[in-house]
Amino acid sequence: MSLFDHKISELKRLIHNKEISISDLVDESYKRIHEVDGKVQAFLQLDEEKARAYAKELDEALDTRDEHGLLFGMPIGIKDNIVTKDLRTTCASKILENFDPIYDATVVERLHEAEAVTIGKLNMDEFAMGSSTENSGFKKTKNPWNLETVPGGSSGGSAAAVAAGEVPFSLGSDTGGSIRQPASFCGVVGLKPTYGRVSRYGLVAFASSLDQIGPITRSVEDNAYLLQAISGVDKMDSTSANVDVPDYLSALTGDIKGLKIAVPKEYLGEGVSEEAKQSVLEALKVLESLGATWEEVSLPHSKYALATYYLLSSSEASANLARFDGIRYGYRTDNADNLIDLYKQTRSEGFGNEVKRRIMLGTFALSSGYYDAYYKKAQKVRTLIKKDFEDVFANYDVIIGPTTPTPAFKIGEKTSDPLTMYANDILTIPVNLAGVPGISVPCGFANGLPLGLQIIGKHFDESTVYRVAHAFEQATDHHKAKPEL
């Protein structure tokens, strides 16, 4: 049995009772990484020397002070688009291959305050653009459940590392499903918080109006611990919300009697596999047995979500990624005769194909003559999608459906057809456009591959999302399954 089979609350008890040390936890993490990461390929950088030194320091602090952080001694992996001082941050892109940040992201500072131990940086799709982690500029992460399948994306490294037992928890980012989709594919728990709940300061921007950092864990309880540690307003991020952060752990009561669930007919329609539908219907039976009720509803503008998302996110990306020009930091070409050539060659050589595709799409959508037809219209449709959610939430507590239309697909299966790859996020994207919170929890298997149940809540009501997810988790055994590597 791995130490990481214990929840945070149990690990903290073992540490305080001196049954294990923090150094033991960190040793367990690096031992497992050295055993299996050659197969899984989840990590891009390890911070072994510093992590071991910090673990010793915390072990000593156990005797010298009474107050300890919320995540005291807990090992964590961080997605490689979240900046970490003096620990290379590449966004899995050649253009940032040797970039060492000079500051920590706010979430990293908050992890330090909570006294978590950073193990290393995790692989991802380049600049978070992708659904399979095949767009990384450095390596392809594999799904621990079947090494021939993708772990999902863009936080594929974050989900795979947790599923493989390399770290007990990780941070990812979610722009159109990039936490929930890999969590579903890898059989772990992944939450996208409400937009503004967690500071984006130090998150390398893909689409600023959609990006949100969130936790990936083995259990709902651990997920609540992590969100507790990283949430709250931040003066360095004007989009972070000045809204009180509740005690998420107190929401895990197991009581969902009288809870009203909405199930959008669009989420169980065309393109959703029979296994995904059945796993959701089985999950609804479990929730009914616990006292909740459910009804079918409609989110009529969901069919426009994919097109809306790719216009808006690509437009924002084309602006955000303009800063990578080879002048101030990052890769710089040796093949330029003048400044214009320097920009052109640096970006052509430094960015991967998917990133270039989205920059071009976004630049086109924002260009004179097309702005009204594409970008402005997409913003209007986004408002309609947000209103659909508000209308449903006027009468229901949560919305439930599958996280993904299918389980994980084979590596290389969709790389030649971007549209089929994009369609994989069709059930997660509307949540980002509406800015509401959503979680994926394990709810079954298809052909030995995990399936995820998506639970969506009202703005800033992560507590109810956690309450439902925890009640379902406690009534089932799906989250206890582990891949064999």
From Swiss-Prot:
Keywords (alphabetical) are:
ATP-binding, Ligase, Nucleotide-binding, Protein biosynthesis
Biological processes annotated in GO? translation
Enzyme class, spelled out: ligase
Q: Which GO terms describe its molecular function?
A: ATP binding; glutaminyl-tRNA synthase (glutamine-hydrolyzing) activity
Q: Mind telling me which PROSITE patterns this protein's record contains? A: AMIDASES (PS00571)
Q: What is its EC number?
A: 6.3.5.7
Signal peptide (residue range) = none
SUPFAM superfamilies noted in UniProt: Amidase signature (AS) enzymes (SSF75304)
Recorded hits in Pfam families, A to Z, give: Amidase
**Any coiled-coil ranges, and where?**
none
Reaction catalysis annotation: L-glutamyl-tRNA(Gln) + L-glutamine + ATP + H2O = L-glutaminyl-tRNA(Gln) + L-glutamate + ADP + phosphate + H(+)
What residues form the catalytic site here?
K79, S154, S178
Gene Ontology CC annotations of this record:
glutamyl-tRNA(Gln) amidotransferase complex
The family database entries (InterPro entries) matched by this protein are listed as: Amidase, Amidase_CS, Amidase_dom, AS_sf, GatA
Family statement drawn from the similarity comment of this UniProt entry = Belongs to the amidase family. GatA subfamily.
> What do we know about how this protein assembles, alone or with others?
Heterotrimer of A, B and C subunits.
* Function noted in UniProt: Allows the formation of correctly charged Gln-tRNA(Gln) through the transamidation of misacylated Glu-tRNA(Gln) in organisms which lack glutaminyl-tRNA synthetase. The reaction takes place in the presence of glutamine and ATP through an activated gamma-phospho-Glu-tRNA(Gln).
Q: What is this protein called?
A: Glutamyl-tRNA(Gln) amidotransferase subunit A
Record the organism.
Answer: Bacillus licheniformis (strain ATCC 14580 / DSM 13 / JCM 2505 / CCUG 7422 / NBRC 12200 / NCIMB 9375 / NCTC 10341 / NRRL NRS-1264 / Gibson 46)
